[in-house]
A protein has these predicted regions:
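Short, amphipathic alpha-helical interaction segments positioned at domain boundaries
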Residues: 352-366
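Immediate flanking context of iron-sulfur cluster ligation sites
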Residues: 2-10
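Local cysteine-cluster metal-coordination motifs and their immediate loop/turn environment
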Residues: 11-22
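A short, conserved structural fragment
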Residues: 335-345
């Protein structure tokens, strides 16, 4: 069995952003204690059942850094003793306002080697609308302290399509990210999810038009690459060698184990998940079955999110035959519109194709 990825969900936040639809909430110390105990239990139990190793650990949320640093280290050290290889990539998502000196001391001790920091925007007005407290000075301080702690693999989150955002304000955010020296950016187009404050206010906020957001996306891709930060997935950019190993497992349709409320797993061709219910997870209930995974359609859908696209080599290695001719013919219909390219028998989307990825990919693979 190849090395899997390990994801641990920490559903706690001090405050919820108005656009966020992830499973997260404020919690008291007793709830956090019981939750961490349940995570440690599931790490032990799953290691006995699976008999495999993981070469990536991603602790996401929520805001994992709102946990006491000792709790985080307990989780990471347990993951090391049960699953992780010696060279594992260990990522912790964090909010700049929840990072004190003890955090950096502890994560350095337990060999965290990657941080993902929520910036979203370097523009004060945009951050206020997004409910983000941390400004440029706080984020730069965190980046500097992380590097002093020996963590140089740092990612910043950036958001496009923010109310009031312009190409000029986006460029200012990108310039800040570039000047901070981080080697990775995750840049997402804001999606208005139901059951969020943004959804209820959608007619009252000055969202950029779809055309303006598309122009900003294309500008961002070109601007970052001019500065050596290369696009490798629809929403992800990195200095070569600093791509997220964990997230590449998802896009390569590789196996991963998810632990925690709302966490999903893909193992043995089956997709399972824990519901968005913390007490369900704490009580030790089993994962629910989502269905089969890893078929040709899913593999192609995920591969086409990558800049490298769907290659004959990777497809053949997985399914022992070439990409179906029908799929290649469908892709060629979009090639003439500049939305994808078919080279060496493979398929990859152009940047304009990425903007329409949901519809283009579904048409190609169906």
């Amino acid at each position: 069995m190849n090395n899997i990825g390990l994801y641990i969900h920490i559903p706690f936040c001090n405050s919820k952003c108005p656009y966020c639809d992830f499973y997260s909430f404020r919690a008291d110390d007793d709830t956090k204690n019981r939750y961490v105990s349940a995570v440690l239990r599931e790490l032990r139990n799953n290691s006995k059942q699976l008999n495999c190793k993981a070469d990536t650990l991603y602790i996401g949320g929520g805001t994992p850094s709102v946990l006491a640093p000792d709790y985080l280290c307990q989780i990471i050290n347990s993951a090391k003793s049960t699953f992780l290889t010696d060279d594992a990539e260990i990522t912790v998502e964090c909010n700049p306002f929840s990072l004190g000196d003890e955090f950096f001391e502890k994560v350095s001790e337990c060999k965290v080697n990657r941080l993902s920091i929520g910036l979203q925007s370097a523009n004060d007005g945009e951050r206020r609308i997004l409910g983000r407290r941390a400004g440029k000075s706080e984020v730069q301080s965190v980046v500097s302290r992380a590097k002093k702690a020996g963590i140089n693999n740092i990612s910043l989150d950036v958001m496009l399509g923010v109310p009031g955002q312009t190409k000029e304000s986006l460029k200012s955010t990108l310039d800040f990210c570039i000047s901070s020296g981080v080697p990775h950016l995750s840049c997402y187009i804001l999606k208005i999810e139901e059951n969020t404050p943004f959804f209820r206010m959608r007619d009252k906020l000055p969202f950029p038009s779809d055309d303006d957001t598309a122009d900003m996306y294309l500008f961002m891709c070109e601007y970052l690459e001019k500065h050596g930060i290369m696009q490798y997935e629809i929403s992800n950019f990195a200095v070569p060698g600093f791509e997220s190993r964990h997230n590449l497992k998802y896009w390569h349709d590789e196996e991963y184990l998810g632990i925690g409320a709302s966490a999903h797993s893909f193992l043995g061709g089956k997709r399972t998940y824990y519901p968005r219910d913390i007490e369900y997870f704490i009580s030790g209930n089993e994962r629910l079955t989502e269905g089969d995974g890893g078929d040709e359609e899913e593999f192609c859908m995920l591969a086409l999110r990558l800049r490298e696209g769907l290659t004959q080599e990777r497809f053949y290695a997985r399914f022992h035959h070439e990409i179906p001719q029908k799929m290649l013919e469908s892709a060629k219909q979009y090639e003439k519109y500049g939305l994808c390219s078919c080279e060496s028998g493979g398929i990859f989307l152009t940047r304009r194709g990425f903007l329409l990825s949901n519809s283009v990919i579904s048409e190609i693979i169906l």
